[in-house]
């Protein structure tokens, strides 16, 4: 059987505000990321784990004021409520021209968010060169 060797270097990692990764594979993706884009409140989790997001994207309803004040140059505010923060972060990566993506933290916590994020994955896949959604399981 042939082993598939994934190369995570140079990819953009979008971190949603679900369960923060704790296993080696997703954490390796974060370490090797070209860019780390936090979906709103996921910035809290990244910072709590000593990881600085390059960008924080969303409607900012889950982002503490202290982070807004500390990192204003990293924040991309999108007020529209027709899409979730993961979709907003995905659009942001498209505007930047980043087309090799890894999505972390898109499952757990809320079942409705998990199902919505999984449903959007096929839509995203049509617009980029490569995309992976990785969990701890």
Regions from the language model: what does each represent?
Residues 1-70:
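N-terminal beta-strand-loop-alpha-helix module at the start
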Residues 112-122:
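Short Gly/Thr/Asp-enriched flexible loops that form oxyanion-binding sites at enzyme active sites
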């Amino acid at each position: 059987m042939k082993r598939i060797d994934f190369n995570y270097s140079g990819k953009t990692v979008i971190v949603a505000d679900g369960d923060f990764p704790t296993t080696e594979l997703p954490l390796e993706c974060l370490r090797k990321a070209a860019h780390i884009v936090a979906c709103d409140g996921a910035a809290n989790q990244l910072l709590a784990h000593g990881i600085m997001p390059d960008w924080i994207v969303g409607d900012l309803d889950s982002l503490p004021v202290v982070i807004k004040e500390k990192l204003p140059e990293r924040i991309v505010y999108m007020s529209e409520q027709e899409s979730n923060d993961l979709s907003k972060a995905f659009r942001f990566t498209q505007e930047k021209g980043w087309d090799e993506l890894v999505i972390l933290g898109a499952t757990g916590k809320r079942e409705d968010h998990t199902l919505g994020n999984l449903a959007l994955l096929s839509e995203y896949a049509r617009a980029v060169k490569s995309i992976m959604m990785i969990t701890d399981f």
